[in-house]
Amino acid sequence: MKESTVIHFPFSVRRGVWLSKYSTFRIGGPANYFKEVHSTSEAQRVIQFLYSHNYPFIIVGKGSNCLFDDQGFDGFVLYNSIQGKEFLSDTTIKAYSGMSFSFLGKTLASSGYSGLEFAVGIPGSVGGAIFMNAGTGKQDTASVVESVEVINSKGEILSYRNEELEFGYRKSRFQNHNEFILSATFRISKNSSSLQIAKDLLESRLLSQPYQQPSVGCIFRNPPGNCAGKLIDEAGLKGVSLGGAQISLKHANFIVNTGRATSHEVKELIRMVQDKLRSQGISLEEEIRIIPYRLP
């Protein structure tokens, strides 16, 4: 189906919603159609309809890893607000995908549960953490995931075990399969030191990352055996600006929005960094999702 086709949805939708409001970068034009879902049944209905009508769509959680286009998105944006968690046992907890990953980690650590302390300070959703296999230099989401529930194109709920999720460094099967991540079950354990561990990790992040400015976290994946931020800094690019976009002075693998940055400016900075490092024989792969105005 072409994006310009007039379509009548059997559920309420919003039009012209500015995606800058749903991105931690504060960048992005209006979505053609926008729908926020709050329940499993609602998500099933929307997903099934979109697939059956072959309508282009993207799924968004907290928007903490997305660079939206200045023109917006000529398709359907499905915004995931499915919240909630439940203990399945003393060693497992199920969390729904729209929940804040950082809040989940903080809640568990405050209750004396270990396993997700590293999540504190990661600004995305549970679903986003699964999608990107979010983590730190020492631990990632894959290390504590037991299983993940998804909604497929028919609106059915399926479950994948950890070994079926194709986890890799900042990668998962969901980057190649457009399934709706519904929930994840995590392995946890009791630990009286968990809250202090979480506090220490958060303090370290606050000291080293530009949390006070709009960004979408690390722009590039670290090359094997090296750190992208260190390489960018050594290339003399820290602090370089283009319009309202700037390579962070605090952490060179972050690009921050200093006021009125556009997606074009951010993408040009990304190209500048890649070209500079490529001239030194180093290839940098983007970690963020760059969402085009139209899907290919």
UniProtKB/Swiss-Prot annotation:
Residues 26-191 form the FAD-binding PCMH-type domain. SUPFAM superfamilies: FAD-binding/transporter-associated domain-like, Uridine diphospho-N-Acetylenolpyruvylglucosamine reductase, MurB, C-terminal domain. It comes from the Bacteria. GO terms for molecular function: FAD binding; UDP-N-acetylmuramate dehydrogenase activity. Its main location: cytoplasm. InterPro entries: FAD-bd_PCMH, FAD-bd_PCMH-like_sf, FAD-bd_PCMH_sub1, FAD-bd_PCMH_sub2, MurB, MurB_C, MurB_C_sf, Oxid_FAD_bind_N. Its cofactor is FAD. Pathway: Cell wall biogenesis; peptidoglycan biosynthesis. Its EC number is 1.3.1.98. Disulfide bonds: none annotated. GO terms for biological process: cell division; cell wall organization; peptidoglycan biosynthetic process; regulation of cell shape. The active site is at R170, C218 (proton donor), E287. It is found in: Cytoplasm. GO terms for cellular component: cytosol. It catalyses: UDP-N-acetyl-alpha-D-muramate + NADP(+) = UDP-N-acetyl-3-O-(1-carboxyvinyl)-alpha-D-glucosamine + NADPH + H(+). Keywords: Cell cycle, Cell division, Cell shape, Cell wall biogenesis/degradation, Cytoplasm, FAD, Flavoprotein, NADP, Oxidoreductase, Peptidoglycan synthesis. The keyword Transport does not apply. It holds the Pfam family FAD_binding_4. PANTHER family: UDP-N-ACETYLENOLPYRUVOYLGLUCOSAMINE REDUCTASE (PTHR21071:SF4). HAMAP family: MurB. Cell wall formation. Belongs to the MurB family. This is UDP-N-acetylenolpyruvoylglucosamine reductase. It comes from Chlamydia caviae (strain ATCC VR-813 / DSM 19441 / 03DC25 / GPIC) (Chlamydophila caviae). The lineage of its organism: Bacteria, Pseudomonadati, Chlamydiota, Chlamydiia, Chlamydiales. The gene is murB.
